[in-house]
Amino acid sequence: IEEDMIRKYNDSFYFASLIGYTGKISDAEYDSLHAINDTYTTEDTIGKSGLEQYYESFLRGSNGEQVVYVDTFGRIQEVVSSTEPIAGCDLYLSIDADLQESTYLLLEQEIAGIVYSNIRSGNISMTDVYFALIDNNVVDIRQFDDEDASATEQAVYASFLTQKNDAINQLNTQFYSSSPLTNNEMSDELLDYVTFSIELLKNESILLTSKIDTSDSIYQKWRAGNLSPKEYLMHCITEQWIDISLLDVNSKYADTTEIYDALCSFITTEAETDNNFAKYVYKYMVPNNEITGKQICLILFEQGVLDYDDDTYAKLSNGTITPSSFILDKINNIEITPAQLALDPCTGSCIITDVNTGEIKAMVSYPGYDNNRLANGVDAEYYALLNEDNSNPQWNYATQEKTAPGSTFKMLTATAGLSENVLTTSREIMCDGVFEEVDNRPECHIWPSGTHKLEDLASAIRDSCNLYFYTTGYDLSTKDTGIYNDANGIAYIQKYASIFGLDQKSGLEIAESESTIATEYPVMAAIGQSNNNITTA
């Protein structure tokens, strides 16, 4: 019996983006780390991401060693010498674990509320919701043809086979038509199937993107949507942008037609079994009612996505509960999460800092993931699902995602305005809903349902009045010459953004993107829009 150590992460979903995980050292990692510390071996476990990776040398400790005599069966006969391993150092964080968990759950609840409202208002359609459950692998379409598939799954699969054959026939029609459609003439459905075909050829390195002459006139027509896939692929063959060695064709003697036939055959053969092509087919089955909302809801129970409930299952089956009300209830109760749907919005982040010490007390990235399933030997199936997940849970939305900061930027604009004497704390600016001084006539968030009327600085911050800060951005742009100048306004905004450190990384000990400050449209930049692109950190 041999003892071994494993990493066990508590409350993994809340902390995974911060802590990261460990794993077996790769050849490249070994070469890099062994060059620094020759005690590394090819059997070591190391930090792969997050704090585990950043503090690898601190957490590592030292390997133990035994010199032994063994018999011909490899059994130890005598221990010649032994060195005990030494544990690495402990790492203490400023994070408040309870606050981290609460923040994660509140953030998820807030995002779920927005998704729920968007569905109720019609901004997200129920067909989008039903397909999202398939597209993001919540409903596993690969189980539909299993021997023990349910009657519902079998019915859906039978319908799918019919529609898949029709989709492949649509492709073949275009590939061999004497008058094929250009991309701009196609339906959205057919264009999706064509897009799949071209992406497949790229991903399999059959279409050699590095060889494509982007200035080529035929390629330009393709880019503009004014060429059929048949004409484009024929041109790719002629220009030798196709690696024919990867096709089932005699590369020495094949002519253009034979190569084209092999290319089309490759596409349609792959489409028969490709999961991404299947999802394109399901995408159009849902709005065409070839797979129903009721079927999807029943499958959520049958595949164990939701805890089985006999009463609810029966009511769904007999129509007492409608699929839409069922799904809305599950979203409202977060039994189906925003991350599972991966509809907009499905991600978020929040950082809470102690203003007295500067310590970070919570740093949440939503959605999280179970880093236990990546440590101590990767769960390959789970890792594949993470990589396919449309909500991208391995991306740290707190430190890596860059977005327009929006109204939080207004405090910086206020500081710039006060410091450059275009504002005073008592100056009042009229909010009448629309800012008329620039061509795009931006509006206040309260317009057209109302206006803020006269606002001073304190009330403008309280109400987050866009007009007040549009005016401040405009006044910064006229400060030097009395004439509006974009560059002058942007220079002032960049100056104060730099003073606040927004153009630099925060220095956190995990992967972090570098924010960029707006370079145009100071009126919009003043409310955190324009091309401001800033991380939460």
Feature roles, as predicted:
Residues I1-L51:
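Non-catalytic accessory/assembly modules
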Residues L107:
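Zn2+-dependent metallopeptidase catalytic core
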Residues S57-E65:
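Amphipathic alpha-helical blocks
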Residues T42-E43, L51-S57, T536-A537:
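Conserved serine DD-peptidase/penicillin-binding transpeptidase domain
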Residues C89-L99:
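Conserved beta-strand/loop elements of the cytosolic catalytic core of P-type E1-E2 ATPases, chiefly
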Residues E65-T83, I95, A112, R120-S407, ...:
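Beta-lactam-recognizing serine transpeptidase/beta-lactamase-like catalytic domain environment
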